[in-house]
Amino acid sequence: MVPVLRNAEARDLWATAAEVARLAEAARSGRATRDELSGSTITITSLGPRGGIVTTPIINAPEVAIVGVNRIVERPAIRGGMVVPRLSMNLSSSFDHRIVDGYTAAEFIQRIRSLLETPARIFMEA
């Protein structure tokens, strides 16, 4: 079951979080309505808590895309010429290229990456 967050573009971060919590509780308790579980265009799935580092998410028809959020792991990174530990997370995605151009899909994923790397931007742009 995938609860559907409607009008996400019109919500601020706090309203989005509240609605996600409400929908998740309705789905877990079996009280979600048919309307709350259908009509979506994109799914965000998280296999990170199950240990997924790299996944290949499958689009839920008739949606146009799915984005998989994977586990955060510590990896070596170079900072100032030194190798240092850095937390890193892979995003996996699948897009229906009959509907979404690959370049547009890549820009979308890069935008998500940018916001996750600098979360303060979420508040600045709201």
PLM feature spans:
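C-terminal catalytic/motor cores of large multi-domain enzyme assemblies
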Residues: 1-126
